[in-house]
UniProtKB/Swiss-Prot annotation:
The gene is yccT. PANTHER family: UPF0319 PROTEIN YCCT (PTHR38108:SF1). This is UPF0319 protein YccT. InterPro entries: UPF0319. HAMAP family: UPF0319.
Amino acid sequence: MKTGALTTFLALYLPVTVFATTLRLSNEVDLLVLDGKRVSGSLLRGADSIELENGPHQLVLRVEKNIRLSGNEERLYISPPLVISFDTQQTSQVNFHLPRLENEREASHFNAAPRLMLLDGDAMPIPVKLDILTTTSTAKVVDYEIETERYNKSAKRASLPQFATIMANDSTLLSDASELDAVPPQSQTLTEQRLKHWFRLADPQTRSHFLQWAEKQPSS
């Protein structure tokens, strides 16, 4: 796909007005999966927010925060993976609101009974369904996209079956510009679908940076 064609494609198919909800990111929340798709850490690095369309959404995340130990020591607390489902139909902004997590006792309570709220732009609670994602993988590195698919097929508290179908891995699709240009014809639709998806999630500044980068890439 030539750079000019890529830019035109994004401009035609991805108008800014399609977005209706801004998910404000938090440096104490590690976002793992969004709507059944693994989130690329490199894509979110430095971003303050993600743009979402109106409708149901599902996040898989971990809370990561430094907590106090005895004396003046600290350690990094990492929560179990959590699944949180919600609807943005009437919401223009979504913010994370975490309970107090300052010491080992509070961390243990959170592990046993996680409490995490989402607030709208007026600091009002958004109805959510929250659950712990129990992973079945014994691998050293857990594939949270696969675990989320399994969860969504199991009719659990925060399951959303519409997000159970996994698409292509975005890290392999977007890792190199030549990979975008050399995709076989039969995969072109999937490539465009994946590009559209991740471009939609990026905030306006990230989209602008991507378009500037695309313009500088040599045509094939």
